[in-house]
């Protein structure tokens, strides 16, 4: 570079200050610039668009959409360029600036000026050495404050949210250096800050960015510029050359600036602008010819007018996301519409007036300045590990919490009440207890035999006088007739004074002071009174006491229930304080704050009680204000106190966070002093500034002064809507009524609002401005969970004072995540979008960003909590608004939305482990779908099923924890019954779970169709006739006996129920495993059993309740029809004959004790053990070595009876005999008592010794070697197996087939538990199709009890042809959320003589009990090799199928086999003939 050029460039080098990006305008360097699409005609005459002055800026700010040559580009919002101070530098030097920073740190910047085509170098050196020193920087281009990211950042540079770069300094001794190379001639300056990340320390230029102006090639040609239409044309040609790709916003910007750079370089090389225009225009000859026919007329319409029309079309269409081609078409369609108007003779002036009527001009202008249309902006979500948001904070189980539900100690007055009520019988009319300075006053009214009798009693010790009268109408004081005066009364003028006397009722340990008044005369309606004690008058809160004779209190008749499942004492305390709480929000919030510690001691149910109370308040079920004036600042202070205590609980007790969040959502944020006072002051300023001091505004002012409430937020919004609708009063009432405020409610306020608003047109602008500002003040106190208010509180704001009105300054929350304010800005700008995908992503990214801050103490924690609650709620609102967007969406988009809502739900729960694994499952399903995996829909269906189970579990939690408190407290507070009944339902609807459930319902049929699953899964295909009966759950009717063939439609089937007698079919929406107990019994008993996935089919079946249906199943479907006429009688008798047949041949043979307490597997015979033990012994030594058989011993038949007859168990035997007699008298409660009694048996020494010997000789561990306690555990497990003979399911099953229950004998098979990776059940003939050439199997993770027991969800299921065992085919992926895992242990299996009888399905009726309790583990299938590794899956499933074939071949018949997989090896633990 020559010295002259260098000096010239360096003379122009500027080092300037700009506002630091996080504090700058909305689209400064922290936020991606928004753009719009506008049409520009390349060869448009200069004056063509000047025919009408545009309401929009015609200056070009970035890229645009060309109508010709059709290039889609963006446009930046114009920003105010702040004046910059110039730093003078030595013209002969490349030193651009030198600074002394805080702490004697020196910063030096040098710039190397380029020659044409070379790089510009910026060297930044700081006398500060740190391994964590970063340059936070970006570049300025085209005089815009918005940062761009240069294409050649130094090594190690990271991109921060596509908004800034962070480059590490290189340490050199005591200094640190960074060298930047800029190759884009359009870049005019570099801006930066320096950050010591480890210290969180920023180095700034007097609080702003350092700004280094760069020398540029453009400085050599200052008098030459490139016309924007040529840049647009060049950008289009680049776009066309690259195949008309759809660009992201960032790519659009880069392409546009690259086009500009190319043209600038041409000019530097000496090409004139005219030559460039000719060159570019020639390249567009083809397009010119194509469009020549309409070119002249198109150019007659200003492009900015076309732009407005295209925006209106886009908004009318629901703001869809358009592709590049669609954008072009839309723009041309808008031009055609306008051209059509012109051809009708309408002038451009008239079109301008028409389409810019009302607010459309401002609205479009704002939209074009700040937003893209045709394409929604997106934030770049960070890649996160879902496990980072895992919560496992589980509240202590209610039953373990020391919550007393015993009746509290009764006061003397309550004891008096009880005794009096018992004495007087059912004639009680009215009862009330008043609180008097720590004592109680009872008033009890009853009418025995037509008389009116009043009892008054108090536990006060001081002498007390009742000053009273009677009344025949309200408010009257009449002297009573002398005949009714109690002894010792003094008759005065118009009243009586009677002294309370000490009295005691029988069996009452306390004395009380009481009065009894008896009135025989009719006509009196009540008794007014006051009390006198020690010369002082005592009133009822300033009024007379009044006893109503005619009012029959509902509370006297109300059954309050026993308060079970609630923090009963706390709820009763709340109910007792409600009279005080009704005075004002200040009273209510202070009372709630006083109760927080008591709620904490009561645990989860305590906070549930507070939540229910606050929810009743928020839904206007409780009185907000009654005869009490309170200043707004007093309300906000009380809110502040309550929310401070709640935030402390949130930190100290993470297990209650979910409930605390819900409580906070019902309470405003509050605030000390000024925030609340502003409500009172600002309304006066609004009235004064806008000259509206009378009418409705004055009435509202009086209400605000005396008792502001959340209703005021709605009233303010209603006024704004009224003004915006051009003073349409119906808009005012619509907003009020939509939010639950009626005329009656307005009139019910202590300071009633009688009038409607009536403003003048000249007040419009001022009122909209001032009421809009006032809304922020109201929301700051009352609407903590309002999104706009919550964002404002977090980012800070300042409202200036005016005269007497105080100012308010809320500081920004410190240490927010980098870029977080811009993220909130994005959310604010897009919150009204109809296409909600980008908004949902922004809301969830914001929640993820602040989550770490919510887990630690922070002085502004509650502001962050209210923000998080608002963001969570906005997700729900957005998805409800976005349902329309999903109408035509494919499964991938619906799955993505499901994952977003699921993430939102997981971020709010105390225990979200199950949801996290569902979330990971959806992520896998999306990946499989995008990669076109064969089984993606099948896998996604399993994740959907599991997600539904998780939602059902959450609903059960609400029902268990909240509903009992709602019912008990609702009864105590006389809340409307409908509000109590739907309490849980409304709480669920208020969260994301309901929206998620709706999306799952929409996705389910899509997945079933894609995976070819159909509407049914037929578990037992039996053709039947039967009458339809609808039940909630099969368990509730398993003991019932139907006297006609019945088709049960059961909402819930767990899997271990018994099928009721007389049932010919069970149809359910639930999903029991195909090989669960109930499924096996259905097949064995020839009962049709199927799951229906289609709610419409289920609804149709339910509509036929009471009618007879004919079910005709195939292996994959069920056809059904209503049976009518003569067919009805024939089908009924056919069913009954079929049902009565087989049971008569079933019989049991009584087994005897054979003299041995324990035997080894070599000694297993039919006389000693059941088929389960014999079959496992038969396999030993016969199966291939790759199939393991566990070592077994047994306690044979007769041991139970022998132990019971031992002298040490005489008392147990006698008690059992009595209970059996009770059972014989049809008292089925004896079954439970029998089981409990069996567990009291003691083990004879001989049994212990024999069992020990046989187990050790077989190589099994003896529990007693680990201590006596371990043997006791084993003995208890043995007794539980014996006791299961009397479980309800087994007892009714044997009785149904007329088996003699006394003949049923129970051996116990003892096996060592194999700590399994997986458990499986095989049916060697496919049970659904009956295909003997095909094996069907189910596999679960962990122990097999989750497969055969009542554990929700489905197992992995597969089939495999016996002639192709290496090719298993997966039918369904697992959805079971829980796996059971156990330490090395012993299992004691039931082995009765009644399990495998021909014609009787006895398998699975009795219990197998492990010595140790299995651990429940929430399963993560995304890390399970059986699901994710195709080769491993094929290997394991093939081995299971091969084992099934081997065992079937050994027995020569179809088998029902149970086994486990451990470290890839197959173990078979039992087998029986497949029935």
UniProtKB/Swiss-Prot annotation:
Active-site residues, record numbering mapped to chain: 1077
Record bears the keyword Transcription: no
Signal peptide: none
Inducing stimuli: Down-regulated upon carbohydrate starvation.
InterPro entries: ATP_grasp_subdomain_1, CWD_DUF7067, GWD-like_N_Ig, GWD1_pHisD, PPDK_AMP/ATP-bd
Single annotated GO MF: ATP binding
Reactions listed under catalytic activity: [(1->4)-alpha-D-glucosyl](n) + n ATP + n H2O = [(1->4)-6-phospho-alpha-D-glucosyl](n) + n AMP + n phosphate + 2n H(+)
Family: Belongs to the PEP-utilizing enzyme family.
Entry's free-text remark on domains: The N-terminal domain contains the alpha-glucan binding site, the central domain the pyrophosphate/phosphate carrier histidine, and the C-terminal domain the ATP binding site.
Protein name according to UniProt: Alpha-glucan water dikinase, chloroplastic
Organism, scientific name: Citrus reticulata (Tangerine)
